[in-house]
Amino acid sequence: MADNSFEFFPPKSAEGRAKLRGTWQELAKLKPRFFSCTYGAGGSTRDGTLETVMEIRRAGHLAAPHISCVASTRKDIAEQLERYRANGIRHLVALRGDLPSGLAAAGEFRYAADLVAFIRQTSGDWFHIEVACYPEYHPQTRNAADEVRNFKMKVDAGANSAITQYFYNADAYFRFVDECRAAGLTLPIVPGVMPITNFSQLARFSDACGAEIPRWMRLKLESYRDDAAAIRAFGLDAVSALCEKLLAGGAPGLHFYTLNQATLSAEIWRRLKL
């Protein structure tokens, strides 16, 4: 049976925390392998990340905080790792991360592979480390060979498993996995799944992260304009079909980018009848 996992971002208000509590409690009924919580640009939400993770853990569920290294010193990261260890956390999602708006590149880590190596150097095998990978290539990647090479650097540094950027073309995932296997990488590569709720928001996210919205899907979504119900129905059908194809093709599980909403991710998972 395939695994699932669900990603949140830390809320900024008491109302947001209450809403997120209802979200993860609903998704917990689906028995996920773990929940994860993002870290904010430049680590800007690190306290909220830890608070969210610990609340989920206190309810008896596995939760993994993200940790990013952009704009961070080794001392910063060492202190954050110690906070996680002191709280019994053993599962991390390690990323380079994004700079806060208006800041130039800084910090002592250039790549996510450097962060993974530092975690292993300072913490040994304490943490299970998830990393990111990009079947449709990172926006800064120059060519296909570089994408696999960069991913291999993270694996060689000590990554245990990987979560992909979201995509809507299953063939991109299968091709990327084949390239990774040919390069000797055997770790689990779990597809990231983005439910579709709002086309303009999705287009903005996709332009920023390099995820392609296939032409047929883009035109279909554009035709619905502001018809939220039609977009939701189409999105459920399209993303559910994508997930079915991924699992049938051997994907080890699915990681849902929930945007702190339970309904669509839960409905897609239930449609898969797993």
What are the functions of these language-model segments?
Residues 7, 35, 84, 154, ...:
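Conserved, mostly hydrophobic/aromatic
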Residues 34-45, 67-69, 93-95, 160-169, ...:
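Catalytic beta/alpha-barrel core
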Residues 1-3, 31-34, 59-63, 88-90, ...:
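Short, well-ordered coil/turn segments that N-cap beta-strands
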Residues 15, 107-134, 183-236, 241, ...:
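Active-site pocket-lining/capping segments in soluble small-molecule metabolic enzymes
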Residues 15-17, 43-55, 73-79, 98-119, ...:
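Active-site-adjacent beta->alpha loops and helix N-cap segments on the catalytic face
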Residues 3-19, 41, 63-75, 128-146, ...:
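Active-site mouth loops of central-metabolism enzymes
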Residues 14-27, 49, 74-82, 143-153, ...:
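Short, acidic/polar
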Residues 25-38, 156:
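Catalytic domains of carbohydrate-active enzymes, especially glycoside hydrolases
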